[in-house]
Design a protein with these regions (language model features):
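Membrane-proximal intracellular helices of multi-pass ion channels
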Residues: 1-485
């Protein structure tokens, strides 16, 4: 069957038009502060609006019945790619980032909530551009498709296809019958949490602008800051505890948080993946705090705990905020950081990585394999939350993990061939595919990605999008069979 190009253009046009309003919001902030960036944001919004009207006009009479999974996957992949292209215009046209490669990398990092940056002096940017930079995080956190499905009824029956293609986690199937309804509710929770974090940060030493920007980055588990020293700029225990806590909230399954808003707290506490996630956080924090104290890196017990809590929360939630140069903590924490980058948060959250849910299924399946060594005739299914996980799901998890690991190893080879150092290559690949944002070596806590080659930046941009869309959506499009009739 031929691809329904008109439908694809119609959907892209609708999303471009909606995205225009977000860019106009950044322009409004720019007009408020009057730092010279207002017109470039208006111009960029105009270009985006024109592209949206053209695409929507061409696809206006699209046949919505002739739509399948191929259209869904292509729309989602094109959305993230083209949003990054149009989203980079304020950076590039305004001269704040002087080449296309860096501008695209920065914007893709924003929309995918990776948080990697090529900027050496973030504080030199005007406030409208800084707000747009944080806003890319906030949109990408819950998923741009999910947001558009929530607000625009034109998607109709195509909503489920798009939702499946973008939110391809292992736990979202329960909501398929009411995709539009659920998308609206999830975004309601998302907005409330963002406002709550902004309010709490404003109660501390942050001004309103910084509080709003960091609230968007925190709930989206993104990591973009308005300061060169990231959250460490304020040197405030209160700020660090608030952000660390809500980074973990952002890494929790958002649907379970929604149930909490309905008063169904038991669903959160009884969920195995959530318990595994917070158990991992607890063990990692206590281990790191003990390590920092015993090694003499930090002799104050409370500060050792706070540093460990913040940095572990930042990495496992795939946020990438920093309050300390963890590279100076030694190889032990580097290895722990890589493990946390690999695992990351829960399915259905704003975080990246392999997800705790998959790790849990892999661990239970491995345990069953050992059991069958002594009881070969036993039928021992994998169970999650008391329910049997089908063999199909287990096989998908195994396949996903294999592809994820293969892509990690292959990508490390690619970057080292391009001249990156060993530590930098490993750190950059883990940070990009897991959407974590911070790596090792010169691209660690106090470094950035500016020294990498243009090829490496384009390749890492591809990894960011691939990781954000959970690999299969993007890689399937690269298969020749995808394009066959």
């Amino acid at each position: 069957m031929l691809l329904n190009i008109r439908f694809i253009l119609k959907m892209l046009g609708a999303m471009f038009i909606l995205e225009t309003f977000f860019m106009l919001l950044a322009a409004a902030v720019a007009f408020f502060y009057r730092e010279g960036d207002e017109w470039v944001l208006l111009l960029s919004a105009g270009i985006l609006a024109l592209a949206g009207v053209l695409c929507y006009g061409i696809g206006f009479r699209a046949n919505e019945y002739n739509v399948g999974k191929r259209e869904g996957m292509l729309i989602v992949t094109l959305t993230w790619t083209l949003f990054s292209f149009f989203g980079m215009l304020p950076f590039y046209l305004g001269g704040y980032i002087d080449n296309v490669t860096d501008a695209f990398f920065e914007t893709m990092s924003g929309f995918t909530t990776t948080g990697s940056t090529i900027l050496n002096d973030v504080e030199a940017l005007p406030k409208g551009i800084l707000f747009w930079r944080s806003l890319t995080h906030w949109q990408g956190g819950m998923g741009m498709i999910v947001f558009t499905v929530a607000l625009m009824p034109i998607f109709g029956g195509g909503a489920t296809l798009l939702y499946d293609a973008e939110a391809s986690s292992i736990t979202h199937e329960r909501f398929r019958p009411r995709v539009t309804q659920i998308a609206k509710r999830l975004w309601g929770v998302y907005v409330f949490l963002t406002l709550l974090v902004a309010f709490l940060l404003y109660l501390g030493p942050m001004d309103l602008f910084d509080a709003v920007n960091h609230a968007m980055s925190t709930i989206a588990t993104g990591g973009f800051s308005t300061k060169n020293a990231s959250v460490g700029y304020w040197d405030s225990p209160y700020i660090e505890y608030v952000i660390a806590t809500f980074m973990c909230v952002g890494a929790t399954n958002m649907t379970l948080i929604y149930f909490c808003f309905q008063g169904q707290f038991k669903k959160l506490f009884r969920d195995e993946e959530t318990r595994w996630f917070y158990a991992i956080v607890l063990v990692a924090v206590l281990t790191t705090a003990a390590y920092l104290y015993m090694k003499g890196i930090e002799m104050d017990v409370e500060k050792a705990f706070r540093m460990a809590y913040f940095q572990v929360s930042s990495i496992i939630s795939s946020s990438g905020f920093c309050t300390a140069n963890y590279i100076s903590w030694g190889p032990f924490f580097w290895c722990l950081a890589l493990l946390l980058m690999f695992v990351c948060g829960c399915a259905g959250s704003t975080s990246g990585g392999l997800k705790v849910g998959r790790i849990m299924i892999l661990a239970k399946n491995l345990f069953n394999v050992f059991k069958k060594q002594t009881h070969p005739c036993a039928v021992i299914p994998v169970r999650v939350n008391g329910h049997v996980v089908s063999n199909e799901v287990v096989h998908k998890v195994l396949a996903f993990t294999f592809v994820y690991l293969s892509l990690l190893l292959f990508s490390c080879l690619v970057l080292t061939l391009d001249g990156a150092g060993f530590e930098e290559a490993i750190g950059a690949v883990f940070a990009s595919l897991g959407n974590v944002g911070v790596g090792l070596g010169s691209i660690g806590a106090v470094g950035n990605f500016s020294e990498l080659s243009d090829f490496s930046k384009w390749y890492l941009s591809f990894l960011m999008m691939t990781g954000r869309l959970e690999i299969f959506t993007v890689l399937t499009i690269l298969l020749p069979s995808f394009w066959k009739q």
